[in-house]
Amino acid sequence: MDMEGLGARIKSQSAMEYLMTYGWAILAIAIVMVSLYSIGIFNLGNLKPTATPGSCQVVRTATQTSLAGQCNNLIPKYVGQFGGTSYIKTGTVGLPLGNNQRSISMWVYPKSANNGAFYTYGTYASQEMVGLLITSAGSSLYFQVYGTDWDTGMSLNLNSWNFVAVAYNPTGNTVTAYVNGNTQTHSLGSALNTALPGSDPSDVGKIMNGQGQYAIGYIANIQVYNASLDNTTIKAIYKEGIGGAPIAVQYLVAWWPLNGNANDYSGNNNQGNATNMVWNANWQSGYTQPTS
């Protein structure tokens, strides 16, 4: 009797029986793992150390402005969760007024295309405010000034993280908008005349000055600058990802990471006062670290 041949047949039969018994389970696990990877879970690009609240901040002295703390290669432990009645009233020190240059960037995870406001400041009057919203028509990024508003037409992905930014230059009254690395530029036709009201001048999660239009979803890492940042700088902010520190700190006037609190870490003390806020630690689904 060919014992070696018999042994080989037994091993082959055992292997086939094993595959028939467990093959479908292995296939199902593989499909689940691929699905989780596609939505950001188990994506090795997202597995970075988490930043504790306030781990990085801007320090201002008489001679310089600089970053201090753990500021590199981190993602936030928390993000701000806005449920339709949530908002944060903020300080206004240094916010660009009149027709001056300005730039605003942030990460947003809209759950509804409901005309909700991500961040706004100013007075609810013609050309006297600035803000970023999501439209109900097309889920696009909307630059509101309560006058010559601009629907950028650049759609935001619902139930997913998006980087959004605008840079305003009074030369030609031009606005450059950014969504996930894509860019468009537009002339408003009229100059801004941003002015602060006596109450409720600056809000995250709704329109300021006693108005509504509440955001529904998550918001993180709001940065406000008193300069019209160029494409290279804003794209560098985007590539840093959701936990990125400000880059052009000499122009920074407000920085709300929303990592577990509403504090301003720009050094300007524009602290936020939060209402109905949840600080969510389970935010990574739908986020992928930018690579280009």
Feature names for model-found ranges:
Residues V179-S202:
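Short, solvent-exposed beta-strand-to-loop segments that form ligand-recognition rims
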